[in-house]
Amino acid sequence: MELNGIKPADGAKHYKRRVGRGIGSGIGKTAGRGHKGQKSRAGGYHKVGFEGGQMPMQRRLPKRGFKSQLLKFNAEVTLSALEQLGASEVDLVTLKQAGLVGELAKVVKVIMTGKISKAVKLTGIGATAAAKVAIEAAGGSLA
């Protein structure tokens, strides 16, 4: 082996194909775009969903349902998040300061995900039936 004989392994390098650089390259002149037509031109392609002037699928199908704007005021907190919080008394302000709920949250509910071992007193916060049982079993309460 000599320094002038070192080269990358076969298939290790993929060189960028230079198109439009003469007939001898095998991919000159039209550069793989064919002849004429929209797709052969610079900037020539349709919008996503364009079906050649036919009424597109997205407009043929009926509208359905709606997204409630009230959902942005609702938030969920898990039992494991309450465990990590480490506070003995928790209310909406505490959760916002800890970053567990968003600033817009007005209604918060504790859900049964994870475990809780510390006693936590919740004020102004709801809980699912299973989460309520788990909180009370750990010595906590809901007010």
From Swiss-Prot:
<comment type="function">
    <text>Binds to the 23S rRNA.</text>
</comment>
<keyword id="KW-0687">Ribonucleoprotein</keyword>
<dbReference type="Pfam" id="PF00828">
    <property type="entry name" value="Ribosomal_L27A"/>
</dbReference>
<dbReference type="InterPro" id="IPR030878">
    <property type="entry name" value="Ribosomal_uL15"/>
</dbReference>
<keyword id="KW-0699">rRNA-binding</keyword>
<dbReference type="InterPro" id="IPR021131">
    <property type="entry name" value="Ribosomal_uL15/eL18"/>
</dbReference>
<keyword id="KW-0689">Ribosomal protein</keyword>
<comment type="subunit">
    <text>Part of the 50S ribosomal subunit.</text>
</comment>
<dbReference type="GO" id="GO:0003735">
    <property type="term" value="F:structural constituent of ribosome"/>
</dbReference>
<dbReference type="InterPro" id="IPR005749">
    <property type="entry name" value="Ribosomal_uL15_bac-type"/>
</dbReference>
<dbReference type="GO" id="GO:0022625">
    <property type="term" value="C:cytosolic large ribosomal subunit"/>
</dbReference>
<protein>
    <recommendedName>
        <fullName>Large ribosomal subunit protein uL15</fullName>
    </recommendedName>
</protein>
<dbReference type="InterPro" id="IPR036227">
    <property type="entry name" value="Ribosomal_uL15/eL18_sf"/>
</dbReference>
<keyword id="KW-0694">RNA-binding</keyword>
<dbReference type="GO" id="GO:0006412">
    <property type="term" value="P:translation"/>
</dbReference>
<feature type="region of interest" description="Disordered">
    <location>
        <begin position="1"/>
        <end position="59"/>
    </location>
</feature>
<dbReference type="GO" id="GO:0019843">
    <property type="term" value="F:rRNA binding"/>
</dbReference>
<comment type="similarity">
    <text>Belongs to the universal ribosomal protein uL15 family.</text>
</comment>
<feature type="compositionally biased region" description="Gly residues">
    <location>
        <begin position="21"/>
        <end position="31"/>
    </location>
</feature>
